[in-house]
């Protein structure tokens, strides 16, 4: 009889709604102490926003960001992991980094994780060591080409 009650309890648990599953998941997280109080709030916000992510993966992401790993590096690594490819093997799919705005930001954040930090460092060094090839400047469509040699306007007439 106890086996039948256990089977019925297991069937009832399998039929539980999404809300009950989420509640059970939260209770399991609190028991395991995977996430702290602030991290739990962030995790619940992420779930409310529709992000379905494993709590352990969420904890790793939060830890990386707490270690000042550049968020762009975390994003690129996640993107490459989801695509099933390494970041270095698919350069045309990676997000372009403008070094003028993010150099000071990434330098301070590269101390973080050894994996993600090295990805950012190698990408930054590679772009710095490449010879710069500048394109010739295109003439402006609104300006007329200079005709006179002096470059000064001769609009005044002498009496």
Swiss-Prot record:
Look up the domain of life of the source: Eukaryota
Key words of the record: Cytoplasm, Cytoskeleton, Methylation, Phosphoprotein
Q: Which InterPro entries match?
A: MOZART2
Residue list for modification Phosphoserine? 153
Q: Name one GO cellular component term.
A: spindle
Region annotated Disordered, chain positions: 87-159
Composition-biased stretches, type Polar residues, lie in: 91-105
Subunit structure comment from the entry: Associates with the gamma-tubulin ring complex (gTuRC) consisting of TUBGCP2, TUBGCP3, TUBGCP4, TUBGCP5 and TUBGCP6 and gamma-tubulin TUBG1 or TUBG2; within the complex, interacts with TUBGCP2; the interaction plays a role in gTuRC activation.
Entry similarity comment: Belongs to the MOZART2 family.
Main role?
A: Required for the recruitment and the assembly of the gamma-tubulin ring complex (gTuRC) at the centrosome. The gTuRC regulates the minus-end nucleation of alpha-beta tubulin heterodimers that grow into microtubule protafilaments, a critical step in centrosome duplication and spindle formation.
Q: What name does the UniProt record give this protein? A: Mitotic-spindle organizing protein 2
Top-level taxonomy = Eukaryota, Metazoa, Chordata, Craniata, Vertebrata
Question: What gene is it encoded by?
Answer: Mzt2
């Amino acid at each position: 009889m106890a086996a039948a009650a256990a089977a019925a309890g297991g069937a009832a648990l399998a039929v539980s709604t999404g809300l009950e599953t989420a509640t059970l998941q939260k209770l399991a997280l609190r028991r395991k102490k995977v996430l702290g109080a602030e991290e739990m709030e962030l995790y619940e916000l992420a779930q409310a926003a529709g992000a379905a992510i494993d709590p352990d993966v969420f904890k790793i992401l939060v830890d990386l960001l707490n270690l000042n790993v550049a968020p762009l590096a975390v994003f690129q690594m996640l993107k490459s992991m989801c695509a099933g490819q390494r970041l270095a093997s698919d350069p045309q799919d990676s997000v372009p980094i403008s070094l003028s705005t993010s150099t000071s930001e990434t330098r301070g954040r590269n101390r973080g994780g050894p994996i993600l930090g090295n990805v950012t460092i190698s990408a930054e060094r590679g772009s710095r060591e490449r010879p710069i090839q500048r394109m010739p400047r295109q003439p402006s469509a609104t300006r007329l080409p200079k005709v006179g040699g002096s470059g000064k306007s001769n609009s005044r007439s002498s009496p």
